[in-house]
């Protein structure tokens, strides 16, 4: 019964809610989440006067500001945490799936989604800073959508409340989502290691869970580990991609030509035509950069910065890094490989085949290790996010923080030895519900972020 209910909710959130017919027997199927996120991104892009382009230098400047204290984080460290969760399987398997289902043109629409998603990320990151509070458990600050939703409702009701229903529902949705993602993470890692090294899933799972437990059960080890892992993995992946591009420099103009031709339906590469290209690019872009879902603000709130806008600008930059840089790296690896090399393959097998073509067996090993690092950092990042939501629901009690970490580790173990589609759907339902609650409140509270932006620009 519960499984059936989850499947129905999943279909409602992620399935095609509206189908728009197009010429040449093509159509666009639009899901509820696309209906929510794309207009929200466009709205805030207009209201911020195209912030991702106009204030890109300020994003870099905000990132360089060093203002962390003993307990709180700098804007750079919060970018590291949010990038850890954004840069995950979606940047590898997700991009592969988008190109497989929507052709090379899907890459262009992922770029577009990132540009408008940056504005949404700015607004939610700024709001997280405006409504943060002291964290007596871990030190520094905590916050996120549960907190700014709570403060908004208190203000409207004109009375203090311990909990607000919508904020509670957001926090619960987040915890459900992140537990589900834990399973997906371990399943992807063990599959990749089995393909690359022939290691049995159980062995990989035990090592993965053991390493994770050592880190997450220590008070503040998560951010310290991510400070090292995330920059190293991102730079290495980018460097390998540059090498592959230079190795195939003669085919790069044709690759970009293919991306733009297929993006606008000038060349049909997949069944479904322009509609399939457009929606696959948009959906994968939204899933990868997480803008609007309310995840990243949990990290943005932890920053110690001169102005709330600095946290917002840093999160906007995070969307750029995730989609424009890392997702594009995967796309270049895929699209510079001959079609006969990747024909008939899907998922990680497809990406590993492309890497084998470019770099031999080293490429297969490299992509397996990269997936491990991307996925492991995602797991650490989502447990950082969970801190503030657990505290909102259960108060400042270590027992509940520890119990949730143990639950996530159990889910990590289960995902490594068995694949339960139900739990994966549960994770997607969780992030879908988070998005509904968060985007709704962004329209109501977004004026605060826009006012902060106006004040920031007036003092530049």
Model-derived regions, located:
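Membrane-interface loop-to-helix entry segments
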Residues: 36, 44-60, 166, 187-193, ...
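Selective recognition of specific alpha-helical transmembrane segments in multi-pass small-molecule
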Residues: 116-124, 204-219, 230-250, 283-286, ...
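Extracellular/periplasmic helix-exit of transmembrane alpha-helices
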Residues: 124-136, 242-258, 272, 302-305, ...
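N-terminal alpha-helical transmembrane segments of multi-pass membrane transport
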Residues: 1-89, 99-106, 117, 413, ...
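Transmembrane helix-loop junctions in multi-pass membrane proteins
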Residues: 47-52, 91-95, 177-190, 213-225, ...
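Helix-loop-helix module between adjacent transmembrane segments
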Residues: 40-45, 113-141, 150-187, 191-215, ...
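Flexible loop linkers connecting adjacent transmembrane helices
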Residues: 50-75, 97, 103-104, 119-161, ...
């Amino acid at each position: 019964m519960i499984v059936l209910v989850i499947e129905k909710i999943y279909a409602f959130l992620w399935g095609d809610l509206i189908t728009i017919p197009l010429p040449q027997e093509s159509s666009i199927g639009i899901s509820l989440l696309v209906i929510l996120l794309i207009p929200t991104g466009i709205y805030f892009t207009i209201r911020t006067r195209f912030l991702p382009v106009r204030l890109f230098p300020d994003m870099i400047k905000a990132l360089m500001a060093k203002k962390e204290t003993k307990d709180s984080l700098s804007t750079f460290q919060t970018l590291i945490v949010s990038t850890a969760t954004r840069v995950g399987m979606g940047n590898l398997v997700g991009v592969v799936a988008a190109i497989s289902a929507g052709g090379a043109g899907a890459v262009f629409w992922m770029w577009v989604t990132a540009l408008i998603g940056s504005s949404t990320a700015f607004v939610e990151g700024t709001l997280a800073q405006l409504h943060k509070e002291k964290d007596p458990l871990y030190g520094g600050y905590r916050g996120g959508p549960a907190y700014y939703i709570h403060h908004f409702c208190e203000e409207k009701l004109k009375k203090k409340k311990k909990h607000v229903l919508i904020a509670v529902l957001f926090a619960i949705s987040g915890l459900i989502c992140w537990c589900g993602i834990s399973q997906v993470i371990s399943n992807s890692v063990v599959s990749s290691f089995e393909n690359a090294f022939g290691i049995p899933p159980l062995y990989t799972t035990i090592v993965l869970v053991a390493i994770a437990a050592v880190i997450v059960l220590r008070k503040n080890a998560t951010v310290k580990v991510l400070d090292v892992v995330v920059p190293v993995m991102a730079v290495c992946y980018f460097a390998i991609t540059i090498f592959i591009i230079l190795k195939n420099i003669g085919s790069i103009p044709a690759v970009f030509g293919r991306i733009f031709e297929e993006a606008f339906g000038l060349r049909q590469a997949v069944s479904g035509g322009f509609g399939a290209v457009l929606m696959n690019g948009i959906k994968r872009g939204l899933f990868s950069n997480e803008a609007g879902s309310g995840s990243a603000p949990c990290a943005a709130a932890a920053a110690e910065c001169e102005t709330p806008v600095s946290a917002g600008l840093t999160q906007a930059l995070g969307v750029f890094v995730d989609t424009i840089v890392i997702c594009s790296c995967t796309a270049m690896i895929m699209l510079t490989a001959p079609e006969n090399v990747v024909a008939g393959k899907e998922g990680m097998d497809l990406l590993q085949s492309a890497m084998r073509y470019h770099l031999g067996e080293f490429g297969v090993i490299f992509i397996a290790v990269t997936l491990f690092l991307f996925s492991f950092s995602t797991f650490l990042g989502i447990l950082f996010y969970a801190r503030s939501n657990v505290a909102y629901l259960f108060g400042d009690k270590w027992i509940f923080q520890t119990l949730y970490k143990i639950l996530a580790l159990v889910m990590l173990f289960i995902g490594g030895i068995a694949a339960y589609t139900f739990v994966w759907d549960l994770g997607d339902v969780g992030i879908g519900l988070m998005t509904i609650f968060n985007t709704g409140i962004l329209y109501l509270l977004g004026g605060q972020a826009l006012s902060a932006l106006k004040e920031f620009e007036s003092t530049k």
